[in-house]
């Protein structure tokens, strides 16, 4: 199984995985409007891989099979105050 990964022009660190190059027919229109003009980032073989860097391989394969696309969102930003307070043994409100 192969997939094509596209980078969003509207949202940093947001990627759209589809089964075929330039085939967004199964991607909802609203998602495409929010995603912007897709910029191809890479063609990726999924078979034989054990993992992906920022996505769960099995979830990607399942989403591609069931809905025809997978949307990778940026990781949540780190809450430095919460981390600092935890290191100090305190809780944030």
Curated annotation (Swiss-Prot):
YcgL domain location, by residue?
1-85
- Record protein name field: YcgL domain-containing protein KPK_1976
What PANTHER family does this protein's entry cite? PROTEIN YCGL
Give the top-rank taxon of the lineage listed in the UniProt record for this protein: Bacteria
Q: Which Pfam families match?
A: YcgL
